[in-house]
Amino acid sequence: MLVKTTHFGEINIKDEDIIEFSEGIVGFEDIHRYGIIRNQNSDSPFSWLQAVEKSELAFAVVDPFVIKKDYDFVLSDEYVKALDINDPSQVNVYAIVVVPDDLTKISMNLKAPVIVNKDNRKAAQVILDTDEYTVRHYIMDELQKQEV
């Protein structure tokens, strides 16, 4: 699918990289279809969620397990059913990233991960019922903890 974007120009997104949120993303509930744009550098854990219907809307995302090795949560039966998940291997998890001017404050939202069923491309942003994670988990702080 050819998609016009503000950030990347006109790009071709493969059908298998188009995902659909039945309820949208928090704050953008009216936007349902996004393309996953993977970083050309295959070693990078970062990707983009580009709205198909709105050229200027794109979210930086990251595989949270790459940054926070002990990230763990249980997906509620409601979401397992809504996304038609039968096996954990069907799932990709992304955390939306905020990139401020001060790059030392780059953060990811671990409180509300994006869950994607790779097989049927259904997606949902799930707000976890826990105080263990926040919407601003600082990536640089996490990486420094791992170096110690």
UniProtKB/Swiss-Prot annotation:
<dbReference type="InterPro" id="IPR003775">
    <property type="entry name" value="Flagellar_assembly_factor_FliW"/>
</dbReference>
<keyword id="KW-1005">Bacterial flagellum biogenesis</keyword>
<dbReference type="Pfam" id="PF02623">
    <property type="entry name" value="FliW"/>
</dbReference>
<dbReference type="InterPro" id="IPR024046">
    <property type="entry name" value="Flagellar_assmbl_FliW_dom_sf"/>
</dbReference>
<comment type="function">
    <text>Acts as an anti-CsrA protein, binds CsrA and prevents it from repressing translation of its target genes, one of which is flagellin. Binds to flagellin and participates in the assembly of the flagellum.</text>
</comment>
<dbReference type="GO" id="GO:0044780">
    <property type="term" value="P:bacterial-type flagellum assembly"/>
</dbReference>
<dbReference type="GO" id="GO:0005737">
    <property type="term" value="C:cytoplasm"/>
</dbReference>
<comment type="subunit">
    <text>Interacts with translational regulator CsrA and flagellin(s).</text>
</comment>
<protein>
    <recommendedName>
        <fullName>Flagellar assembly factor FliW</fullName>
    </recommendedName>
</protein>
<keyword id="KW-0143">Chaperone</keyword>
<keyword id="KW-0810">Translation regulation</keyword>
<comment type="similarity">
    <text>Belongs to the FliW family.</text>
</comment>
<keyword id="KW-0963">Cytoplasm</keyword>
<dbReference type="GO" id="GO:0006417">
    <property type="term" value="P:regulation of translation"/>
</dbReference>
